[in-house]
Structures are given as structure tokens and as C-alpha cells.
Amino acid sequence: MHCSPELMDLTRKLEILADAAKYDASCASSGAARKDSRDGKGIGSTGGMGICHSYTPDGRCVSLLKVLLTNACLYDCHYCINRRSSNVQRARFTPEEVAQLTLDFYKRNYIEGLFLSSGIVRSADHTMEQVIEVARQLREVHHFRGYIHLKTIPEASQALIDKAGRYADRISINIELPSQQSLDRLAPEKNLTNTKQAMHGIRQRIDESLAAKKEARQIVNRPRVKAPTFATGQSTQMIVGADDSTDALVLHRADELYREVRLRRVYYSGFSPIPEPSVLLPIKPPPLVREHRLYQADWLLRFYGFDVGELLPKEDPNLDLDLDPKLAWALRNRSVFPVDINRAPQEMLWRIPGLGTVNVARILAARRWSRLTLADLQRMRVNLKKVQPFIVAADHRPRIALLESPQLRQHFLPGPRQLELNFNALPAATAADAAMALSGQI
């Protein structure tokens, strides 16, 4: 029998609420475990419960305490481990407890800030008030100047969301799924229109804050601002693989949000099967590579000048899992290649598979002084195997037959993986058994 959330030991609360927060991708982890930190123990370890890594608006990587205020929730979203009907142990922090935990972790140099989200209790406004109270105490009572990322609730009043933005460095609202049809099926309490309206309100406050700061810079003897006037950006998360939405629909929604509300980032989170799942959910998670391809396509939309329709034509609404999106586009549009790297404009160089924005900048700078060769590209650490079929250099021109060959796609496909025998998984096996298996005797 579970004990009351209010009477629970603080350490146990942290275990439960840090674990419950891991499903939110809006606070991105580096994705890699540091050497000797995998067990979360030892001096200097940042792999303990509730600690994740994210990036600040100025590009710094910071360690954050990532927790929920509570995992109790009024909503019954089918894909969520913390849904109302889920049989999980519930816990709840008070605002004072979260503020003190943040300070304790910060003083011990475990973290540089806080990522705080919450299940919905009583009402959206009540929950939002509790989340804001944590940030208020940190900023006004304890004079905390570390990084704060607050997960806001679209159903909360705009006044409360505005108040959250005055305390936080970044705020985010999860859109969850790309269409209202999917929300009606899997998260009936959520409304896409409400979410977008809240995002537009945040964008307006960010614009007003930037304008005020610009005006303040023109005043010589202005008082120093010790905390952000308003959050410097917002982000969101979409769950991938919980419904039948195509990659085209997901990316069209992301592209719309980038353009309309100027999101800093859309996070794509592959659906993870949960205990006691709804019959409306898939049995298996989507391939992990699908999430990776969506991030690659997202990058092309934001920084390389691609449109969703170019990456995903109507006849093929899902990304190729075997090839990265830029390479897949190039193979569908071979008529625009080869591209002369010594003459092509920047926008065309960005579209060459294997060339990123950094290498394109180097090429543009270097070709002012001499015609570039493959050796020059190699010195720039360009992947020659990937770019050669698509470029013309001073000493290289690809064979048209190769560029037009149906076999070119095969050239870029990953090779077959060697299966490994894991003898550690067979405790009964002896060294002699292993030797016989390797020699083909069994």
C-alpha cells in the first residue's frame, strides 16, 4: 500500500519525481554517460537521480535538476505514465522543498539550474501557481541567479503564464501530438488551439521584453537588471510513434510553430511503451532512428533552407530510415548535381550531402584565394566518400554514369552488422563451450 504523498521521505519523493520527469524531452540530455559516472555515485558524478544536461540561450551546456512538482494528474492521456488511471506510486513536493533541493544541489556544484514540470492537480491554474511559487522563492527569497526552465500549462490563465516567464530563463508548453484528431483520441483533455494561443501569448511577451531591453540600452544610467525581464525563448515537445501521424505531418506542425511563434526548439520524443497500456497505443516503440531522422530534418528546415515538401513529397510522407534526409533529397533530385564548389552560391552548397554550415563557410572563405581541390576538402575534414558523387572540384568531376546509376543509393547504405555472441548472457556456458561455438562445433 502506497503512503501519503505528503508523509513520504524527501529522498523517496526525489526518486519518484525525478524518474517521472525523464519522459519529458524538452530538457535535452547529452545522451552519453560520462566515464565512471554511470552508477550516479562518487565525487563529481552528474549521473545521479534528477540531473540532466541542457543548453542555455547562449549555448552553454548546463547540468539541471529535472523533477516534477507532483506526478499526480487529473488528465488521463493514454501515452503518459503519470495519467490519472495509471497504477503508479504518487508523490508531491511542496514549493519550499523544491526550492531547497535546488539550492542544496547548486551549493554542492551538482547543478547549475532547475527544470520543473508537474502533473495537473486541482486545476491548471492551481498547479501553475505552485510551479511559479518555486521560481519566485528561488529568485526573490534566495536570490538564485541560476538557470530556470519552467514547463507551463496551456490551460492556465495567460496572466499566470506571463508571471512564469518573468522568473524563468526559458519556458515551454508541450504540444504532445501534431493534430487535434490525435489529441482527441489519446489526450482528450488537451486542445491544440489552446496550446497555440498560449504559445502566441508567450511570443508576444518575449517580443515586448526584447523591445524594452533595446530601449533600455539607450539609457546611460539605467539600473542593472539582475534577472530576466521575460524568458528568452520557448520550446515544445512532440511524441512520435504513439499515433499514426506521418513524419510529414509532424514536420509541418514543427515548421508552422517555428515560423509563427519562433520556437527555439521542437523536441521529438519516441513513444515508450508503459505499464498497463491502453489498447489505443502501439505495442512496440518506433525505431529509435526515426527520432534521429526527425531531428536531422528539423535541422535542415531551420538552418539549411529546406522546405518540408522538399524533404517529404506527398507520395512519400515518411523519412527514409536508411539515409539521412539531405542525402535522400539529393538522390531524388540528381538533376541539380554535380555542383561546382568553386562557383556555387552558399544556398546550393548547403544542399550538398556531407557539407555542413561550418564547412560551407570555410569553402566560401578559401575559394576567394584559389580553386579548391579534393585535398583542400580533406584538410577541412569533409567526408569525401559522401560528397564526391555530387561535386565538381578543381581536380575532380564525377562520372555522370555514377551519378545517374540506380546503384548509387546502395553505395551509401550502411553495411550489414556483424552479430556478436554474448557469452556473459549465458551463465551456464563454460569457456570450453565458447571455444566450441566459435569453431563451429555446436
Regions found by a protein language model. Name each.
Residues 279-350, 386-433, 437, 441-442:
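Long, highly charged, low-complexity intrinsically disordered interaction regions
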Residues 1-72, 383-384, 389-392, 396-442:
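Flexible, acidic/Gly-rich N-terminal and inter-domain linker regions that tether
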Residues 67-96:
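Canonical Radical SAM [4Fe-4S] cluster-binding loop centered on the CxxxCxxC motif
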Residues 101-117, 297:
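Short Fe-S-cluster ligation motifs
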Residues 64, 77, 116, 173, ...:
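Conserved, mostly hydrophobic/aromatic
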Residues 339-366, 370-389:
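Helix-hairpin-helix
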Residues 99, 122-311:
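Conserved AdoMet/S-adenosylmethionine-binding subsite of the radical SAM
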Residues 65-68, 96-107:
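Short, charged beta->alpha transition segments
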